A protein has these predicted regions:
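N-terminal and secondary-structure boundary signal
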Residues: 1-220
Length: 221
């Protein structure tokens, strides 16, 4: 129990603190879910408090720069979600996720189906990669958590939907596995995901998970 910020700090501390992941002078990329232009109370996106706390922890660990981005589905999602304001107050930098020029064609030799894609260069270039989605119901994939959040790092998400979505989600993790996974299940969306209709779609759980293992954290979620 506690606030999101308190739970993020406690969860990261159990893994050795942010200094176990971030060294002084390193660049960090944080990938929340900011797909939708909806206010925080609707639970469609990662809560701004969760993202901002991760930015603060990275800065305190000595990160040179902390970049935050998503490949949004709605225009204005950075602002409408409250994430942009929170990140900038915490000392982070919002990076454009909606411009194809920011994505680099990358091969994926371990993949079964999703063998090549354009991946956001912020993910490819960062010293440390953190993923931090909310736990939600999803009409297409049943649930969305850390592995599904990887979809927002590639340009052509449509190709994933057309070609065995579940396998493509698993394949996409191989482009680059996150160093730290934080799953915000404080107020998960249990129906009508991934966007939701109203706050009745949310259930208070006051839970937050953190792990180095993206498969383990999704299984626990």
């Amino acid at each position: 129990n506690g606030t999101r910020a308190e739970m993020v700090r406690e969860a990261v501390e159990t893994l050795g603190g942010m200094q176990a992941f971030v060294k002084p002078g390193q660049t960090v990329v944080i990938k929340p879910n900011i797909g939708w232009n909806k206010a925080p109370e609707f639970g469609a996106n990662t809560h701004p408090e969760t993202v901002a706390t991760l930015v603060e922890l990275c800065r305190q660990a000595g990160a040179k720069e902390v970049r935050v981005f998503d490949h949004c589905c709605h225009n204005g999602a950075y602002e409408g979600s409250g994430v942009k304001e929170a990140v900038e107050k915490a000392g982070g930098v919002m990076v454009d996720g909606g411009n194809e020029s920011q994505y680099v064609q990358t091969e994926n030799p371990k993949a079964r189906k999703f063998t090549s894609a354009k991946v956001h260069k912020a993910v490819l270039e960062a010293d440390v990669y953190i993923t931090c989605p909310p736990l939600k119901h999803h009409s297409g994939s049943e649930m969305t958590a850390c592995m599904k959040n990887v979809m927002g790092t590639v340009w052509d998400r449509g190709a994933m939907h057309k070609n065995d979505l579940h396998q493509c989600i698993a394949d996409a993790v191989y482009f680059r596995k996150p160093d730290l996974c934080v799953l915000d299940a404080y107020m998960p969306m249990v129906r009508n995901g991934p966007v939701g209709k109203d706050t009745n779609d949310l259930v208070e759980r006051k839970t937050l998970l953190a792990s180095r293992d993206i498969v383990a954290i999704d299984a626990a979620g």
